[in-house]
């Protein structure tokens, strides 16, 4: 394309007409005008910039945009407006379904399993999918379903219980949000709370709320009543208790277990009419920390037709047993291996000898250029996280630390700084190991070996999300010889290349498995510091001398006082 010709289009240049003028104009070759070519090139470039032009689903939605706008208006009667006669479902029989499942290594079991969807077009023809919800999906860049969405969405829309396990970053949040929003739309005649989502952490609950809010944008259930989604925060809990806000105002509520139980026990929120109960990170919500709280929530949801769903990146056997006991003929969906990590993550083990060697290893990563931001570093305790933060801060690394002792406001600010790129390296405990979706994390470092294979999968799952590649490095020492075995098993199941010594390593004995389960495999670690032992001893002696001097002065003062 001639850029000067484009820039001077507005100029008025008089030219002679006739055959002579055409002969003098070298842009006309073989009877074709170059200006015409330029216009074609321009239109071609515009098409290339329109990333979704080749999607059939986009063009269909654009054709119906005016109809959708009418449906969005709160002053007009809602219409389904789903003219689905021209759209044919991609998956029509069990042969096509098995071929699709084979392509993404999906394992689905249960009674009377619904066919998966091959695209979002399937939802329109099979379930009269709402056009406004489809628009919201497309506007947020979701044009094709992920494997776990292909399986779980039709199961949920058939009102079946589901136990789903998929790799980190595989789209599990939308797998339960899309059918939930659709079911709320279908049940628009009933007012009050119908959908309840439970999450183990505030950060994850907030993230789910944001995604749910995007999906439900501009969706009206009645003439002037929009679909209402709420995050059960401390302030909202107080409003519900004081009857400032009615508990029937919201259609979907997202909460952590303890906060929800507190509101329910104060009779500020009625869960008896809830029809859809979803446990995100189910393995955490049904372990010994949360199991009693989760049981209380289940007891409060007394609707006979209650649909239950459990989602996680790892599903231990005890969670499967609980699922079978509380669910009615559940469909079990496993994408990949239930104990494997995301295949987009390159996993690596580094032997550091001792605790001092870990700091040397991090500094070596910086020197060798492997320390590429954004980076998340996981440690096993708050004390160790603080200590590492001070060490790296003095190395002039753009770093901050997040843990349970920080306030909610501080944690939110740090997460926001990390997401915007203002912060390069984030040190944290397992408080951020689950569910939080950080776009583009290049590297995850396990400074301390995780307590279990499930914790390892969730930690390294902060990278390699949404189809991107990532890297995970785990430091280990001599005392981690038992604790490292589950990590090696995950690496093997994920298809990672492992060293010869890993292949030759003996399988875990029953005693070793019990020690890992009870936390005995992780022995007490030394303090993180680079101060030499002689300097430490010198400081300790100085502190003892100062303390002794103060003690002597106090004794002298007390003697003088009594002598008087």
From Swiss-Prot:
What EC number(s) has UniProt assigned to this enzyme? 3.6.4.13
| Gene Ontology MF term list | ATP binding; ATP hydrolysis activity; RNA binding; RNA helicase activity
Keyword tags: ATP-binding, Helicase, Hydrolase, Nucleotide-binding, Nucleus, Ribosome biogenesis, RNA-binding, rRNA processing
Q: Which reaction does it catalyse?
A: ATP + H2O = ADP + phosphate + H(+)
| Principal subcellular localisation of the protein | nucleus
Annotated ranges, domain Helicase C-terminal:
344-506
**Domain Helicase ATP-binding residues, every copy:** 153-333
Q: Where is this motif: Q motif?
A: 122-150
Residues that coordinate or bind ATP: 166-173
Work out whether the entry's keyword set contains Isomerase.
no
Question: Positions of the region Disordered?
Answer: 1-25, 62-87, 512-564
Tell me the disulfide pairings in this chain.
none
GO BP annotations of the record are: maturation of SSU-rRNA
Span of the annotated motif DEAD box: 280-283
Its annotated compartments are: Nucleus, Nucleolus
A single GO CC term, please?
A: nucleolus
Function of the protein: ATP-dependent RNA helicase involved in 40S ribosomal subunit biogenesis. Required for the processing and cleavage of 35S pre-rRNA at sites A0, A1, and A2, leading to mature 18S rRNA.
The entry's family comment says: Belongs to the DEAD box helicase family. DDX52/ROK1 subfamily.
Question: Any domain commentary?
Answer: The Q motif is unique to and characteristic of the DEAD box family of RNA helicases and controls ATP binding and hydrolysis.
Query: Whom does it interact with, and what assembly results?
Result: Interacts with the U3 snoRNA and is associated with the 90S and 40S pre-ribosomes. This association requires the presence of RRP5. Also interacts with OSH3.
Q: What is this protein called?
A: ATP-dependent RNA helicase ROK1
- The record lists the organism as Saccharomyces cerevisiae (strain YJM789) (Baker's yeast)
| Annotated gene | ROK1
């Amino acid at each position: 394309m001639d850029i000067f010709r484009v820039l001077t289009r507005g100029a008025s240049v008089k030219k002679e007409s006739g055959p002579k003028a055409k002969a003098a104009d070298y842009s006309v070759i073989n009877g074709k005008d170059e200006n015409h070519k330029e216009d074609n090139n321009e239109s071609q470039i515009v098409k290339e910039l329109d990333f979704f032009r080749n999607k059939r689903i986009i063009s269909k939605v654009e054709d119906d945009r005016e109809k959708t706008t009418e449906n969005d208006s709160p002053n007009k009667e809602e219409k389904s407006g789903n003219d689905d006669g021209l759209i044919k479902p991609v998956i029509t029989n069990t042969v096509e379904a098995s071929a699709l499942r084979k392509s993404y290594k999906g394992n689905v079991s249960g009674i009377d399993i619904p066919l998966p969807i091959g695209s979002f077009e399937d939802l329109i023809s099979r379930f009269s999918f709402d056009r406004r919800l489809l628009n919201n999906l497309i506007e947020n860049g979701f044009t094709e379903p992920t494997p776990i969405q292909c399986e779980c969405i039709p199961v949920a829309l058939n009102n079946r219980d589901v136990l789903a396990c998929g790799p980190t970053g595989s789209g599990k949040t939308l797998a339960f949000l899309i059918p939930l929003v659709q079911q709320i739309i279908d049940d628009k005649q009933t007012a009050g709370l119908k959908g309840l989502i439970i999450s183990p952490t505030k950060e994850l609950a907030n993230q789910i709320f944001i995604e749910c809010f995007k999906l439900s944008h501009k969706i009206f259930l009645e003439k002037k009543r929009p679909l209402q989604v709420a995050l059960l925060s401390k302030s909202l809990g107080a409003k519900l208790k004081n009857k400032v806000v009615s508990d029937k105002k919201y259609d979907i509520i997202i909460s952590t277990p303890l906060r929800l139980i507190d509101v329910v026990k104060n009779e500020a929120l009625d869960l008896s009419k809830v029809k859809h109960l979803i446990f995100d990170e189910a393995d955490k919500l049904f372990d010994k920390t949360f199991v009693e709280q989760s049981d209380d929530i289940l007891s409060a949801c007394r609707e006979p037709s209650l649909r239950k769903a459990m989602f996680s990146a790892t599903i231990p056997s005890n969670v499967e047993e609980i699922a079978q006991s509380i669910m009615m003929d559940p469909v079990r969906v496993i994408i990949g291996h239930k104990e494997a990590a995301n295949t987009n993550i390159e996993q690596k083990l580094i032997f550091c000898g001792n605790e001092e060697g870990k700091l040397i290893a991090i500094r070596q990563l910086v020197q060798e250029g492997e320390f590429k931001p954004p980076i998340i570093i996981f440690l096993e305790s708050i004390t160790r996280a603080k200590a590492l933060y001070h060490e790296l801060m003095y190395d002039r690394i753009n770093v901050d630390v997040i843990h349970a002792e920080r306030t909610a406001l501080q944690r939110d600010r740090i997460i926001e700084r990390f997401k915007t790129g203002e912060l390069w390296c984030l040190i944290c405990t397992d408080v951020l190991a689950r569910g939080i979706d950080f776009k583009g994390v290049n590297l995850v470092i396990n400074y301390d070996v995780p307590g279990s294979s499930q914790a390892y999968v969730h930690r390294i799952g902060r990278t390699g999300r949404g189809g991107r590649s990532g890297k995970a490095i785990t430091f280990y020492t001599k005392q981690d010889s038992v604790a490292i075995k589950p990590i090696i098993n995950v690496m093997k199941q994920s298809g990672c290349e492992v060293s010869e010594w890993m292949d030759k390593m003996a399988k875990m004995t029953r005693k070793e498995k019990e020690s890992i389960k009870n936390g005995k495999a992780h022995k007490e670690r030394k303090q993180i510091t680079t101060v030499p032992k002689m300097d430490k001893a010198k400081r300790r002696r100085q502190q003892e001398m100062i303390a002794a001097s103060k003690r002597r002065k106090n004794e002298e003062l007390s003697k003088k006082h009594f002598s008087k």
